[in-house]
Amino acid sequence: MTIDLLPGHGVRLPAPLPELRFGLTEAAVRGLLAPHGELLPDGVRNTFVCGCRWALAFQLPGVSVTLCSDDRDRFRGVGVGRNPNDDRPACPVGYHGIDLLGWPANELVEALRAEGLPVPDPAHGTLRLGSLYLSRHPAPRRPSAPGRKPRHEGPFTFDVVFLSERADPSDPSERAEPSDPSEATE
């Protein structure tokens, strides 16, 4: 049961949920999700995302999923965040075959680099790679000793990932294989 982020293409939800391609209308997205109501017990609901004409949200095990549009009313981005209030094991979120959430950030960066992706070092709990953005929820701050500043950022994991439509077609991280080989010629 994996959510696969498909750069330049969209998102493949866990089977039997559908694959959602960037460019779909809100009605098309709702139509694709409607037959799977039993897998989405809290339903698909409207939500607010700044700068989006429409946004939809639903829950999967351990994660919240948000789909949002561009100014042309077309699906343009998917966000997935860990849901700390859900006791179920979280649905993995795959990108180029690598689970993005729940692993130490430095290990995640090494795994992405091993795939040949030009991944920068995470800075201040965030990482941007083309149209992929990862962030963490703010960590509880422990007070520093009086007069001392922390020397470095401690280890952390990412809690939220957002994938938008293709940012740069020449970027190797922006390529994904469609699930239907007939789509490869589009």
Report each predicted region and the residues it spans:
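Short helix/turn-capping signatures at newly exposed starts of structured segments
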Residues: 1-171, 180-186
